[in-house]
Amino acid sequence: MKSRAKSGSVKQWLSVSALSFSALALLPMSIALAAETVSSQAQKQFNFALAAKPLPQALSDFSRVTGQSVVYTDEAPYGLTAPAVNGQMSAEQALQKLLTGSGLSFRRTDSHTLALEPQPTAGALNLGATTITSMRDDSLSYQPPETSSVMRSSASLQEVPQTVNVIPAQVIRDQAPRNLDDALANVSGITQGNTLGSTQDSVMTRGFGDNRNGSIMRDGMPIVQGRGMNATVDRVEVLKGPASLLYGIQDPGGVVNMVSKKPELTPYNALTLRGSTYGDGKNGSGGTFDSTGALGDSGLAYRMVLDHEDEDYWRNFGTLRQTLIAPSLAWFGESTKLLFAYEHREFLTPFDRGTLIDPRTNHPLDISRNERLDEPFNNMEGRSDLYHFEADHELNDDWKAHFGYSWNRETYDASQVRVTSIDTKKGTLTRSMDGTQNAISTDRFTTASLEGKVNVLGMQHDLVFGVDDEYRKIYRADLIRQKSLSTFSYINPVYGREVEGSTVSAADSAQTDELRSDSVFLQDSIHLNDQWILVAGGRFQEYDQYAGKGVPFKANTDSNGQKWVPRAGLVYRYTDALSFYGSYTESFKPNSTIAPLSGSSTVLDGSIAPEEAKSWELGARLDLPGQVTGNIALFDIKKRNVLVANAEGPTTIYSAAGEVRSRGLELDLSGQLSERWSMIGSYAYTDAEVTEDPDYKGKRLQNVAKNSGSLSAVYDFGSVIGGDQLRVGAGARYVGERAGNAVNDFDLPSYTVADAFATYDTQVEGQKVKF
């Protein structure tokens, strides 16, 4: 056995606006100590999800998955079709399946190269000059995989008439994002929404989205835990635009799917130790242990991920502490794969609502960015549990079945000191000692689907259809509302004069938001010929939403209904590497509210139509195997049936009459510019405004930047001193000015964040170590 370590990652956040490489020497970098026991290339296991297609395309996909080159004569594989290959197996096992019935065999020329040759039969082809289809080891590649699980099928992204962005595993390892917002900075058209004091993931895509809106998935199933990004995440996928056909009730911006690390039959063990500092005595430490491998020779494999973080908060007080335990078990049969995973997380995080807008200037208060306006007890403390089960079975070469079940729960208590008013003449604030106790969020999701292909009238139909069932409940038992003991000076702040709130407000407690839904969906990709693909489908969904608050409880939403959501698209494969597409998609989301609507006793029921969105998109996708993947898209989204308040005398009447629109341009590029250079970059122009509303017509949508972009590049020096490896990278992201509220009376300023990292691989006593 040969022992080596798997790559780790280092990332230092140096400033919200600038970074210099000289500062890297002053800040401790993360130290990754890793050791991995590896089999030979012939024994290493890979996860394959390759659809049946022309053999040259299949070989290109094979090289991308394995990082191994396939060489052949110019004419050898052409005119042949490779069968579908799915499941976990070695590169040689997969290639043998791809070559079934082709009259070709292969031999290994070195650890990274396989050569095709004719089987020893009469009339066999003679191999002449070779063509190299891939030369790069995929382990460091910034190029996304050809397929994406967010599409709920094994279809190539070149055949999908909608934007799909993937943040590859190596980008995650290099950048070491602390949360989902950091990871999504690599994707065009995404800004951060209301994170509830930095305690929730809140993603706004193409101008739409919020926290707790059901758009964040783990392995294709929804989660309700506040923060989903952790040491178990391998890569992140984003499906842009309305996604109700695949995911039911959604905002029209899209969905985000975090793909977890899975058990592998190939042994791997890594220990990572981290240290960090913000200066001024604010330090942190942490570590991660990641272990996977086979359990005997029965096809069983395990994975265990342990992670702990304990660090001082970057502002003037606070502690961030979290512990993660995530075991998983998989069984790989000949045609069946089973997966069970569990994740337990305990956390303590500052509940920090940031600064305040000065009403005299409509800009943030002129105080230090380190100064908090709350109290040291302003924290959220809780735990989350996630159970996940999947079963996949290949019925034959053309059809496979999938079953998935997920149960997610998060509980927490939080103190939330809120600013209720400001006196700029005295430089003081009035605050409320608020909080939430015994909050419980739960989501249960079950899905079953079939994917396969049939030929009708000489045309191939790629079908996926299934059923989904979901129950989601967000419940906050006790809401604390307590007046402060004194005013607070933001000019000369003094902390510790207040006590943590304990007065429960019966009228605000028992906050409940409950959703039940059942649906069936179908999608058909019709290959009209070798270049044109027509995609069409729909979802029929029944839903029941119930929400309200108070002791005694008062329902403010009691709505149920049915909805049919269609989707259609057309793809033109100009070449194997370049495709063009156009699509029409829809989404819907029931109108609901926990609190009573202002000035009204209206209960939202079935008479209030759900929000509905329609989107048109035109785009092009470039995919050069072993090099880069790019996507450019033009989109136009209109969402109607937005709740509108209309005053009729002393009464406020609410109706679903409003409309908002978002349109724009997006560009994404990721992959290998050369053997040394890797990059990932994006740009988005988003024009989002209210188009129908008696008060807000013409106003920009809140928190949506017209211009945003990011660019990160990495240079791999290769072998330096004694065979050691050196990689360095840097990047920046920009978010333009955004409307600060619905009435647009102030703007949030633009900002730029720059980052850098460096990794150095060496050997210590035969074990590979990465700094």
Regions found by a protein language model. Name each.
Residues 64, 69, 86, 128-266, ...:
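Acidic, small-polar-rich N-terminal luminal/periplasmic segments of exported/outer-membrane proteins
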Residues 232-234, 245-327, 331-337, 385, ...:
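Outer-membrane beta-barrel translocator/receptor signature
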Residues 309-313, 326-394, 407-441, 484-513, ...:
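Acidic/polar loop-and-plug regions of large Gram-negative outer-membrane beta-barrel proteins
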Residues 326, 330-332, 441, 460-472, ...:
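Structural signature of Gram-negative outer-membrane beta-barrels, strongest in the C-terminal barrel
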Residues 387-410, 433-548:
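Face-selective signature of the C-terminal outer-membrane beta-barrel domain
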Residues 390-406, 410-418, 580-581, 609-672, ...:
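Membrane-embedded beta-barrel scaffold of Gram-negative outer-membrane proteins
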Residues 529-531, 636-638, 655-741:
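Gram-negative outer-membrane beta-barrel transporters
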